Each structure stands twice: as structure tokens, then as C-alpha cells.
Amino acid sequence: TVEFLVGECEEAARHLPNSYESRYLGRIVKGAALALKARVLLYAASPLFNSDDPYVAVTDPELREMIGYPGYDASRWKLAADANKAVLDWAQNESGWCRLYDTPDDPVDRYEEIFVNPAVPEIILDAGLMGTTTNGYFCRFMLPGQIMGAHDVPVNHAVTFNFTKQYQKKDGTDQVWDEVEGQSYPYEQYQAKLGELDPRFHASAFISGSEWSRGSGTVYHFYENNNLYL
């Protein structure tokens, strides 16, 4: 339940340190427990679960409680707001290191950096395992599916088209995608539409025909036979 998760986070926060020495980067700190609590309460307060009308129509009261609260309660938003404020207060007053990332000057470069640099002080908790250029972990976790060769390593995770469609265009309007079933569209047309998206998309997703590491000048393309390697 939400109460159980919140209670566990609060208990953990009472015992976790604010930071570790650099060699232990990635271990859970107090702020991570506070942030998880804040996220749980934010989800709980959202219309998905905090609503008079459930996202799945059910008549069984027990089943209704399994998919969300039985009714809307505005106080859940107050709990979520207070929990998120506690994370900000911890970052500013207790952590000694957690702050908004303000370098480099270009905001898009800063946005990209949080995806590739686990040491960015804006990140409270990161995955930690990035690997090296020899073990392939970095590529497997960072590259879209099918750009890595199969060999003896698993296919990595990829950004889905549904995820891509969540991004608006640079002008703040929704992108219009060509999705008529059974209809083929020129590859260049799809590329052009991707190029119109919010810069944050290109700072966090690697797509065919783009630079691996923005500004490097090195452009890669995906191939149907999966024979492209980095």
C-alpha cells in the first residue's frame, strides 16, 4: 500500500547518510529515500489513482481499491507537495552536494549531460553501472535497440515510438505522425519529423542519422542487417 511504502521510505531516511565518499558514488543516500517517498505520493495524488472515476470501470469495491482510491481527496496533493518540498530542503540544507546542474552554459548540453554523467550533482540516485568501452555495458544501456551486434551480448533496451511521440515540436505544438496502417512513408520524411522535435529529445535519445554525442561530428545510421558497430 501507499502507507507501507511511505513508512519504509521514512524509516530508511532516518538511518541513511546524506552522502558518501566518491568511491561509493551510487549508494543510496537519505535524499533517495525522501525522493522515492515524494514520487510515491505524487503518483498516489495523480488523477490516475486519486479520482472519483477509476481508469478501469469496476463495480466490485475490493477490486476498486486495488486499482486506486475509492474517491478523490485533495489532501493527497498536499501530502505530495510537502514530500517533494522535503526533498528540495534536503538538497539545499543537508546534502552538501545536491544542486541544480549549471554547467555547461547551453541548457541542452546540460540536459544531455544528466543522461551520460552519473556524477552530475543534480542526480540524487543513478543506475551506477555504466561499464567501459571494452565490456559493452555502456552501449547496451545507452544505445537504441539493434544498433549493437548480436554476438554473445543481449540486445539492449530501446526508445519506443510511443515514447518518441510524447515529445512536442520545438514550437510547442504536437507533431503530426504519418501512421496510416499499411502505408509506407519515405525515410527522409520520418527523419525530418524527428528533427522538428523538442531539443530535449535529441539530447536524450540517439536516433539513426544523428551524432553519437552531440557536437562530435560523428554520425551513425542503423542498418537493417544489424551490422553497425561503434
Task: Mark where each language-model region is.
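An aromatic- and glycine-enriched ligand-binding surface/loop that stacks and positions planar moieties
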Residues: 2, 27-34, 41-229
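Hydrophobic alpha-helical packing residues
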Residues: 9-12, 87
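Conserved catalytic neighborhood of penicillin-recognizing serine enzymes
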Residues: 1-7
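Flexible helix-coil transition and linker loops at the boundaries of alpha-helical arrays
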Residues: 15-26
